[in-house]
């Protein structure tokens, strides 16, 4: 990735999309391999579009492309983000540290997962939003249930 200009301020966040076709290898190793490949290609593409040009235009184009992909009815879009190691439970803006953190999902969002450290730091919470059909499958996965607790209570 190229260095950002000296007069650039703020944070730049982007996403990497790994497009999987029906005939692609859908095993975990195949998916990880595809994400790594697409991450490399993203870096190369980003380097090209920002060289000598206006970085804000490159950012706008990236956001526009992502929006088209994420809202397409022809694509099953899955989004996973991790807030782990951000030490969010240590943040205090003057009214005290948070008791419990959660992402905000709308009713219409599906196929979204957000990983967050537990307050005590001994585990990870996975906040997941799925369609009703996928939720039923997810909640009946015996192997998954061995390692999880659905809807844990807030420990203060």
Descriptions of predicted regions:
Residues 1-156:
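Acyl-CoA-dependent O-acyltransferases
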